[in-house]
């Protein structure tokens, strides 16, 4: 129970599909904005990709419920959610573009996005926040996944990557 009457909910949303679409878009919109901002900052592609993976994993680990699981529901494949699919494709493409700057044309450029999304499988869905958002630190899981994303590309880990990434995330948030 969320404390909202059905009539009130349908006053704002014409259908269950619209409610779900709004929820889906709310999970990908902040990440898409952050990814776009990080991709344009003045930093090496290795640092930008590392920061993007860490930032996205950080977001996936910062909610009470595992909203990333919504992406896996069969209904999401429906054409009714085309707007969401476009946003998610843009996010995926940003990961791929930065990885391509590091590796060139190589199928491994698809992997950093999927490594990041593994945070969904690595966290509980029991109403607890695994890693509250912090401007001072990144969750250990986010660091591990970001390291893995660069390792799979055969890229060097940037020096002082955690502090530099926190600064990049802060810069992106301020834009």
Q: Where do the language-model regions lie?
A:
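Helix-turn-helix
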Residues: 1-18, 22
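Hydrophobic alpha-helical connector segments
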Residues: 22, 26, 36-62, 87-90
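Residue-level detector of well-ordered alpha-helical segments, enriched
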Residues: 23, 48-52, 66, 108-112, ...
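Amphipathic alpha-helical packing segments from all-alpha helical-bundle domains
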Residues: 32, 72, 77-124, 136-143, ...
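Amphipathic C-terminal alpha-helical segment
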Residues: 59-62, 112-136, 147-162, 173-174
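Short, structured loop/turn "capping" segments at alpha-beta junctions
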Residues: 63-68, 95
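Short, hydrophobic secondary-structure boundary micro-motifs
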Residues: 67-72, 159-162
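Eukaryote-specific, intrinsically disordered low-complexity regulatory segments in nuclear proteins
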Residues: 165-167
